[in-house]
A protein has these predicted regions:
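Glycine-rich beta-strand-to-loop/alpha-helix junction loops that act as flexible
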Residues: 30-32
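Catalytic core of pol beta-like nucleotidyltransferases
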Residues: 1-23, 34-41, 51-122
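Acidic Asp/Glu-based divalent-cation binding sites
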Residues: 43-45
Length: 122
């Protein structure tokens, strides 16, 4: 049976929601799977943004990831909303362009960007 990214992402989102619940601000996927260019060797670049990131959240998240199939393929990052919003606006533009939402939206971030941010991102 071959790897089915959409089934896997559905399971990932379910596990994240079960683990972090109302604290989730955004879940997304980046990289080759988001672009539709994945191969058998591709890793899974997942993004989780919580309302705030606590040190214990990293341990909890790692434990959650360890329960998922294809653990060896999972990479990406976890962050708090405030930390993300403090990135440079040029980096935020690139992040928003490269991330496919699975739960939540980056519209609030995009609304704060202007053409100067877009030009600086290239």
């Amino acid at each position: 049976m071959s790897f089915q990214i959409y089934n896997w992402l559905e399971k990932y989102v379910h596990e994240v929601v079960s683990t972090f619940g109302y604290r989730i601000w955004f879940i997304g996927v980046q990289g080759s799977y988001a672009r539709g260019e994945a191969t058998e060797e591709s890793d899974i670049d997942v993004v989780l943004i919580l309302d705030t990131l606590l040190p214990a959240d990293l341990r909890i998240y790692r434990g959650m990831l360890n329960r998922l199939p294809y653990r060896e393929k999972i990479c990406g990052f976890i962050s708090g909303r405030e930390e993300l919003e403090n990135w440079s606006k040029a980096d935020l533009f690139q992040f928003c362009q490269d991330t496919m939402p699975l739960k939540g939206s980056l519209d609030e971030i995009v609304a704060k960007l202007d053409m100067a941010d877009v030009r600086r991102s290239s």
